[in-house]
Amino acid sequence: MTLQLKYSGMNVLRHHNLCNSKCVSGIVLSLVLGWAMVSFAAVDPRWSFESDGALRCDLDGKDSLPDKRVEFVTHGKRVIMRIFFPADDGNAMYVKGPEVQWPIFKRDVRDKSLIIPGKDTRSTDLPDIQVNGLPWVPSQRTAYRYDGFFQVLYAPQKGVRATRTLFPSIEQRMALQVWTLENTLSEPLKIEVPPVQETLLRRKAVDDKDWLVEYRVTGVAQQTLQPGDSVQFAVAYTARAEADSPLVIDPAREKKAYADLVGHAQSHLKLVTPDALLNNTFKWAKVRILLSNIETKAGLINTTGSMAYYCGFWANDNAEYTSPLVPLLGSADLEKGIDTMYRVWLKDIAEYGLKDKQITGSFESYNLKPYQRGRGDEAMILYGLSHYLLALADQTRAEEMWPLIVRCVDYLKLNLNSAGVIASRTDELEGRLPTGQANLSTSALAYGGLQVAARLGRQLGKTPQADQFDQFAKSLAQSIETFFGAKVQGYETYRYYEENDLLRGWISLPLVVGLTSRQAETLDALFSDKLWLEKPETLEVNLKAVSTEKRTQWARETYYALLAAFKSGRTDLALDKIRIALTSHMLGHGGPFADEDDSDLLSPTILYARVITEGLFGIEPLSFRSFQLTPRLPDSWPMMQLNAIQLLGRQLDLQVSRKGSDMNGAKISNGSPQSRPPACESGLKNGGRSCAEPQKYGSNMRMLAPFGSDILVRVLENGKELKSQTGKPGSVFEIKL
């Protein structure tokens, strides 16, 4: 049953009986103190939340989405694995293992170097398990679960319940599956799993040495398993030089190392809001991002997280998208990967020569061969690097990398066309769609990068250069308006290139970098049916790259549009649309991450995190000792927090609350907080449940406003308040440390 409701001036759909009592679906708008529970979806999502925020996909035959596959990519520093269960995988005897790759074999960008356990090498991925002396196989799968680790849960079979936990080794060339066998009977069972060490493949690696890919089972010596007890063993796929000793498989040690990374994601840059969907998807997105370093000949570098494009970096994915976020996560490993990437670029420009030459846009494969050029890469690098260095507030690294910023600016100046915008052969789509001789993305990113680079230059005592950057940015802003500003398909917005007569998704970028003259109609265009694709019946949601009937969805444009909406002060619109997008991307077809289809690219997941940091909270470094906040607290929220954020070399807690409430969101009356309903306590504190059903607060479904309109912003360090200011939602708060 689906009811049409009117919510904040927008039509939304409410679907009854959306999930069972164990979970709350992410499509629920978890709202406190009378805010309606609504949903856009006409079908149940594939994934739902458990009470601790873990994602769960129950295999109960009720999945109505057209694409039944479950797949995603994860990796450690020296191994990458794709966890994949095809749509027709209903036979319990067919237990597919992960697809595994190792960077050491990646000679060329087109070299897939794909090892597929269970295909050609082994008939199944099922270890030889003996129960009471007889062969044992697991029963049908009952659920998938993701809490940082991916688990496959099985129904009991002959008194044994199996669970498989799949994850990569953080440090070793090893992909692991840890099997847990539990005795569900009231009597003892004898369990035995013979150990296995089998060579699957011998091949030359990038170092021209002979390497072995091995299938290993740690095994279980015959033992008696008492009722309720369990035993574990590991299945591993490993790669090693033939001359080296076999890798030591220590499942407990490997699991702890991986759990430590998951713990970092849970405790750093911690989002606390009344919305369980945002809290939990943000948490799991951080796990995916923290796993984005991989080994190359230059050392660890930040990569795209993809099965197809692993072992390399790109000016758009890793500089433009990822760099601004990395300092906030407080991960030394991630910073190391970003630093190594920029040092490769520094070395390249030193060797490549004159400032009128294009900068290499990507370095691909284990040996980091230079590939792309002419995509506006200089603007992408300028934007990402300047944001990264200013947020780090590290004088030494900023001085080291400043020449790369100058080199990018010099090239951009040399490539101004007669209209004063930047000429570029193509953009990040690399010719998939027309871009003319000059495109909006390149000039908009250059404008945004110049502004931040000028701030950075002043911190380094390079005031004359900083002044030049500011002047360049001012001139470029005027040229963007004159050259790209246009009426397109009825909207006063931007054309993407000179001959362009169709709306393009990248019209969000001027809004992202602070160009506001065409803000209102640009947002209208972005979320019109010409660009915004929303199909409740299939949970399909994305922004089209171009307003045609052809399939041109590009998920990164979706999150840039959402960032633009928040930055433009359209908080309710942005919040509504981001919930819809997350339901589709993280709880629907692509769950549990927002990675792009086919390539499993990490970029949308990173951009989602930036929608929160830059959009919802409006974090923007101003200098090495100051930053500004523009908190866009939704009208229906009493509070929001972003805790343990690493910013300007300090670990801070950012807390925003409605004036007249405490930091937990309780309304204050006569000096003391009024208690919330228990369901709302759960929604705020454990992040796994939404607030109470709307009928408890009246049947008219109106959004109540129980708090004052002013907000209180507090900045804390180690529990000590550094700053406290009040103002209106959307006000700019400058914080000096």
For each predicted feature, which ranges?
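Structural helix-adjacent loops and short alpha-helical linkers that scaffold large soluble proteins
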Residues: 272-279, 325-342, 389-406, 454-474, ...
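Non-catalytic carbohydrate-binding regions of carbohydrate-active enzymes
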Residues: 464-493, 521-650
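Aromatic-rich carbohydrate-recognition surfaces in CAZymes
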Residues: 183, 223-225, 231, 310-419, ...
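N-terminal secretory signal peptides that target proteins for export/translocation
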Residues: 1-21
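Hydrophobic alpha-helical scaffolding
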Residues: 224-226, 247-251, 268-275, 311, ...
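Extended glycan-interaction surfaces of carbohydrate-active proteins
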Residues: 272-313, 337-373, 402, 408-438, ...
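Terminal accessory carbohydrate-recognition/targeting modules of carbohydrate-active enzymes
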Residues: 20, 38-280, 328-332, 570-574, ...
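Bacterial N-terminal signal peptides
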Residues: 26-36
